[in-house]
From Swiss-Prot:
Pfam families: Peptidase_M20 (PF01546). Expressed in cotyledons, leaves, and hypocotyls of seedlings, and in leaves and pollen of mature plants. GO terms for biological process: auxin metabolic process. Mn(2+) 2 binds at residues 127, 129, 187. Hydrolyzes certain amino acid conjugates of the plant growth regulator indole-3-acetic acid (IAA). This is IAA-amino acid hydrolase ILR1-like 3. One of its GO terms (molecular function) is metal ion binding. The gene is ILL3. Its EC number is 3.5.1.-.
C-alpha cells in the first residue's frame, strides 16, 4: 500500500470513530494530531538515521533530542547513564508512568541506497531505534500540549546502549524510573503491516547471555603428540557435550537455546598443535530461571570436560561488557489495559496477538522493578521495501509508522494516568 493510502485510511478511521466520544477522545485526538506532525517526525527520524551512534556514545543523538525538548518547553535531566535523557511532563505528582525508547545504532554498513542513508561508515540504524526515539519525541509533543490536563506525571526515558550494553540497567541505577508505577515500550516489527500492533501477556522475549571459553593445553610439535595436552580435541569434545544439554536435559516444550557460534585456535601452523583454543556463543531462555540454569550447566560441562582432557578452562560470561538480559515478561493487568487503548486508537482489527520471540531486550530490567509492557508495532510495506528483518544491512523503515507510534505512546500514558488517578486518590 502506498504511503499516501496508509495516511488516508488512518485519517478516515479517526473521522469515522470520533463520533463515539467517551474514552475514544484521547486516542482519536492524539492520532489526528500525530498525523499532522508527520513531516516533522520524518525530518527528526532522518537526522538521527543519517548520524548513527553506538552504545553510550550518543552525543549527536542526545543533542538533537535535547534541542527538540527545549523547543517544546519540556524539562529534562541530562546526562543519565552517560548520554541518556529523562524528560518529564505533567503535574509532577503521582500517579507516574514511564515511556521508554532506545537510541543506539548497530555496527553495520548500510547497503540501502536512498537519500538519507547513514553518513557514518560501519554504523547503521538497522534495528529501528531511530524510529523509537522519534516516536517518543512525537509523544512528548502531543503530551506537552495537554500537560495541564494530565492527571499525574509522564516520564520519558531516552535510553542509550540497548544493543548489548544493558543501558536500561544503568538508567535504573541512576534513578531514571523515579516514582514510576508502570512503564511502556515498543519495537518496530517487519512481520506486521504498518498500522497494526502486536500484544502478548506473560513471557514475550527471551533472557539472553553470551559466553566465551579458552581451553589451554600443552603444545609440542605434532611429531610428539604423545606428550601434548591437545586443546583442539578438548574444545571439540566440549562443544559436542554442550549440545547434549538441550537435546537430553531440557523438556522440548520449553524454549532453551545453547549455540556455539565461533571457534578459533591460538595458531595456524600445520605441524604444531596450538597452545589454546577459544570458542563461544549464546544462551537463550524464555525465563530468567531457565537462563540461570543454562549458565550453571554450561560451566559444569566445560569444567568437567577440561578435567577429563587435562586442560585448563577459562570461562567468561562477559558480565561487565555484555551482561545477561532477563526475560521480557509483560504484566497481565497492563496487557488488558494496553489492548483496550490500542483498540480504541486503531480499531480491534488492527491489534494482533504477538508470538514469543527468542531475541533479548533490556527493557526487561525495567520490568524487574515495576510492571511493564512491550508492544510490537508493524512496519511491513512491500511496496516501498520495508520487509527486511532488523539487524540486516538492507533494513528499511516505513516512516508511516512514526505518527502511529507517537499517538500510541501518548494515549497509553494519558489513559494510564486517567485510570490510576482514582486509585491514587482512594489510597491517600
Amino acid at each position: 500500500m502506498a504511503n499516501s493510502s496508509i495516511v488516508a485510511l488512518l485519517l478516515l478511521f479517526v473521522i469515522a470513530s470520533s463520533v463515539n466520544g467517551g474514552d475514544q477522545e484521547y486516542p482519536n485526538q492524539y492520532l489526528t494530531e500525530a498525523l499532522g506532525d508527520k513531516e516533522w517526525l520524518v525530518s527528526v527520524r532522518r537526522q538521527i538515521h543519517e548520524n548513527p551512534e553506538l552504545l553510550f556514545e550518543l552525543h549527536k543523538t542526545s543533542a538533537l533530542i535535547r534541542r527538540e525538548l527545549d523547543e517544546l518547553g519540556v524539562s529534562y535531566s541530562y546526562p543519565v547513564a552517560k548520554t541518556g535523557i529523562v524528560a518529564q511532563i505533567g503535574s509532577g505528582y503521582p500517579p507516574v508512568v514511564a515511556l521508554r525508547a532506545d537510541m543506539d545504532a548497530l555496527p553495520l554498513q548500510e547497503l540501502v541506497e536512498w537519500d538519507h542513508k547513514s553518513k557514518i561508515d560501519g554504523k547503521m540504524h538497522a534495528c529501528g531505534h531511530d524510529s523509537h526515539t522519534t516516536m517518543l519525541l512525537g509523544a512528548a509533543k502531543l503530551l506537552s500540549k495537554r500537560k495541564r490536563m494530565l492527571n499525574g506525571t509522564v516520564r520519558l526515558l531516552f535510553q542509550p546502549a540497548e544493543e548489548g550494553g544493558a543501558g536500561a540497567f544503568h538508567m535504573i541505577k541512576e534513578g531514571a524510573l523515579g516514582d514510576s508505577e508502570a512503564i511502556f515500550g515498543m519495537h518496530v516489527h517487519t512481520g506486521l503491516p504498518t498500522g497494526e500492533l502486536a500484544t502478548i501477556s506473560g513471557p514475550a522475549l527471551a533472557s539472553t547471555s553470551i559466553f566465551s571459553v579458552r581451553m589451554s593445553g600443552k603444545s609440542p610439535a605434532s611429531s610428539e603428540t604423545y606428550s601434548c595436552v591437545d586443546p583442539v580435541l578438548a574444545a571439540s569434545s566440549t562443544i559436542l557435550a554442550l549440545q547434549l544439554i538441550i537435546s537430553r536435559e531440557v523438556d522440548p516444550l520449553l524454549s532453551h537455546v545453547l549455540s556455539v557460534t565461533f571457534m578459533k585456535s591460538g595458531g595456524s601452523e600445520f605441524d604444531v598443535i596450538p597452545a589454546y583454543v577459544e570458542f563461544g556463543g549464546t544462551l537463550r531462555s524464555l525465563t530468567t530461571n531457565g537462563i540461570n540454569w543454562l549458565i550453571k550447566r554450561l560451566k559444569e560441562v566445560v569444567e568437567g570436560q577440561a578435567e577429563v582432557q587435562r586442560c585448563k578452562a577459562d570461562i567468561d560470561m562477559h558480565e561487565d561488557d555484555h551482561p545477561m538480559y532477563p526475560a521480557t515478561v509483560n504484566d497481565h493487568k497492563l496487557h488488558e489495559f494496553t489492548e483496550k487503548v490500542l483498540k480504541l486508537l486503531l480499531g480491534p482489527e488492527k491489534v494482533k496477538p504477538a508470538n514469543k520471540v527468542m531475541a533479548g531486550e533490556d527493557f526487561a530490567f525495567y520490568q524487574q522493578k515495576i510492571p511493564g509492557y512491550y508492544i510490537g508495532i508493524g512496519i511491513r510495506n512491500e511496496e516501498i521495501g520495508s520487509v527486511r528483518s532488523v539487524h540486516s544491512p538492507y533494513f528499511f523503515l516505513d516512516e508511516n509508522v512514526l505518527p502511529i507510534g507517537s499517538a500510541t505512546f501518548a494515549a497509553l500514558a494519558e489513559m494510564y494516568l486517567q485510570e490510576h488517578q482514582n486509585q491514587t486518590k482512594s489510597g491517600d
